[in-house]
From Swiss-Prot:
This is Sucrose 6(F)-phosphate phosphorylase. Monomer. The lineage of its organism: Bacteria, Bacillati, Actinomycetota, Acidimicrobiia, Acidimicrobiales. Sucrose 6(F)-phosphate binds at D58, H96, R221, L222, D223, E264, H326, D327, K434. PANTHER family: SUCROSE PHOSPHORYLASE (PTHR38784:SF1). It is an enzyme of class 2 (transferase). Catalyzes the reversible phosphorolysis of sucrose 6(F)-phosphate into alpha-D-glucose 1-phosphate (Glc1P) and D-fructose 6-phosphate. May be involved in a new pathway for the degradation of sucrose, which could become phosphorylated on its fructose moiety during uptake via a PTS system. Shows strict specificity since it does not catalyze reactions with alternative substrates. GO terms for molecular function: glycosyltransferase activity. Belongs to the glycosyl hydrolase 13 family. Sucrose phosphorylase subfamily. Keywords: Carbohydrate metabolism, Glycosyltransferase, Transferase. Optimum pH is 6.5 in the synthesis direction, and more than 50% of the maximum activity is retained within the pH range of 5.5 to 8. In the phosphorolytic direction, the optimum is reached at pH 6. Optimum temperature is 35 degrees Celsius. The record marks D327 as: Transition state stabilizer.
């Protein structure tokens, strides 16, 4: 892979997305599903979420180490996927590791004598001289620094831990944490931020890339990469040029291992971070697309969606798009922010959020340093429920996704038209909003799903998108009025055309290949 080839190296095939245990309890269950005749030629990629590795929180995103979780996956499973011709996408959680990682456990055991003393970020050392000491011993950064901090939870992002000498230390902890005292002994759970100024961290990154490549990875999603670079005086989210410097360094390592990097970042459209990523030859995770599809179907208008499609073409943006995913439906991404126009007006976004909540969704917000809400972030719901649990709407949304330029990623629960699992979200407690869209399916659920027209129709369209050479050709938007959507692909004599009526939610797909014309009608 050349330095200029990251976007060009992104595979143009349909990608399944699931946890290793989403189907019948383990990765072998997904392999069995993909070996069924209904799935022949359907998927060329599989994004396996990080609970395939050893982890302890956040369903995989709190990594202990990158060895395979033997309860859920095996080398034989990976070999079987390779035999099916399915390339793999894995996560590398750049910003943090679990408290349970060997590195943090060594720090807790040996304290200042640990070889990993600088592997994580000592909060007080980082902010030394830049704030005041709180009564409990941690530094409270001065207001000009606090105003720049981007928070994922209320309060300061710190975890207080006790060293062997009895001293309490404070470590940067952007995401989850929990401290318990049982019989006088402290226990910790948390996702601890890594110190990207430490050479040991970069050795760890290199070793991890090499391991993922050995597993058969083609794409590596860089989870939470925008939080990695931290410097006094800068925001802790996508500060520049430090973030770009880190990303370029990671790119060099990835290219040595034949890997395509997919940086994961949620940011307002108006910040134009997606443009910068694309201009630097990185694929873009299209977090704009889900909300734009909902808007197009709810409003029966192509206006906002076509504006984004036009930008993809004009700026040569290589995307990975999705409807649903393991996370929520992004909404902050659609905003313009203080620097520019959004893909949707704020009032339209607020109205969409209200509709999704009326349809059973849950809201995730972002917070300031004082614990107050500063922005909505995402709505947690299955995409089927977000569309009002209408088969016709989900079928139309899938067709639009498969015809829009980009690598289409398909959440397993959307494929099976899964509804909001409100009971699971309630059982999971205050932070359980994401469980609404993570229902595991048994082999019997898969069997029953494959008897439903909405599932079979999606698979029919997915097979066409994955296998037809038309989608390796030239794309165009056919001019129509704003209630229709015509998207056309042509590669030589092979043509695929989507003709959708957004008002009636009916559409046809016409496919011409080797002198034969096939028309798929859905109404």
């Amino acid at each position: 892979m050349t330095h200029a080839g990251m976007k060009a190296s992104l595979p143009n095939r349909v990608m399944l997305n699931a946890y290793p245990d989403s189907i019948d309890g383990d990765l072998a269950g997904t392999v069995r599903m993909l070996q069924r005749p209904e799935f022949t030629d359907a998927f060329g990629l599989f994004y396996v979420l990080p609970s395939i590795f050893n982890s302890d929180l956040d369903r995989g995103f709190s990594i202990i180490d990158y060895d395979l979780n033997s309860d859920l996956a095996s080398a034989e499973d990976l070999a079987a996927l390779d035999e099916l011709g399915i390339m793999l996408k894995f996560d590398m959680v750049l910003n943090h590791l679990s408290v349970g990682s060997p590195q943090f456990q060594d720090l807790l055991k040996h304290g200042d004598d640990s070889a990993f003393r600088d592997f994580f970020i000592d909060w007080n050392e980082f902010w030394e001289g830049e704030g005041e000491l709180h009564a409990d011993g941690h530094v409270v950064p001065s207001p000009e620094h606090l105003d720049r901090l981007f928070m994922r939870k209320p309060g300061l992002p710190i975890l207080q831990v006790r060293f062997p000498d009895g001293s309490d230390r404070f470590y940067w902890n952007t995401f989850y944490q929990r401290v318990e005292t049982i019989d006088g002994e402290r226990s910790y759970l948390g996702q601890m931020d890594l110190n990207a100024e430490s050479p040991r961290v970069w050795t760890f990154y290199r070793e991890t890339f090499e391991k993922l490549a050995r597993y058969g990875a083609k794409i590596v999603r860089l989870d939470a990469f925008a939080y990695l670079h931290k410097a006094v005086g800068d925001t802790n989210f996508f500060n520049t040029p430090g973030t770009w410097d880190h990303l370029d360094r990671l790119r060099t390592i990835s290219e040595e291992n034949g890997l395509v990097l997919l940086p994961e970042i949620h940011g307002e459209y108006g910040t134009k971070i997606h443009e910068e990523l694309s201009d630097r030859d990185y694929p873009v995770y299209d977090f704009f697309f889900p909300g734009l599809v909902i808007d197009a179907i709810d409003s029966a208008s192509n206006t906002h969606l076509l504006r984004w499609i036009d930008e993809i073409i004009e700026r040569d943006i290589a995307t990975v798009n999705m409807l649903g995913c393991h996370d929520g439906i992004p909404v902050i991404d659609l905003k313009g922010g203080p620097t520019g126009q959004g893909l949707l007006p704020d009032a339209t976004i607020e109205a969409m959020i209200s509709r999704l909540l009326e349809r059973g969704g849950r809201v995730k917000n972002l917070y300031g340093a004082d614990g107050t809400k500063v922005s909505y972030y995402q709505v947690n719901a299955t995409f089927f429920s977000a569309l009002g649990e209408s088969d016709a709407r989900l079928r139309l949304a899938r067709a639009i996704q498969l015809f829009v330029p980009g690598t289409p990623q398909v959440w397993y629960l959307d494929l099976f038209a899964g509804a909001n699992d409100v009971e699971a979200a309630d059982r999971a407690g205050a932070d359980g909003h994401k469980e609404i869209n993570r229902t595991n399916l048994s082999a019997a659920d898969v069997e029953a799903g494959l008897a439903r027209p909405i599932v079979l129709d999606q698979l029919e369209m997915i097979r066409l998108r994955n296998a037809s050479p038309a989608f390796d050709g030239r794309f165009e938007v056919v001019p129509t009025d704003d209630t229709r959507l015509q998207l056309r692909w042509q590669n030589g004599s092979t043509v695929a055309l989507l003709d959708a009526d957004l008002a009636t939610e009916r559409f046809t797909i016409t496919h011409e290949h080797d002198g034969h014309t096939e028309i798929l009608g859905y109404d």
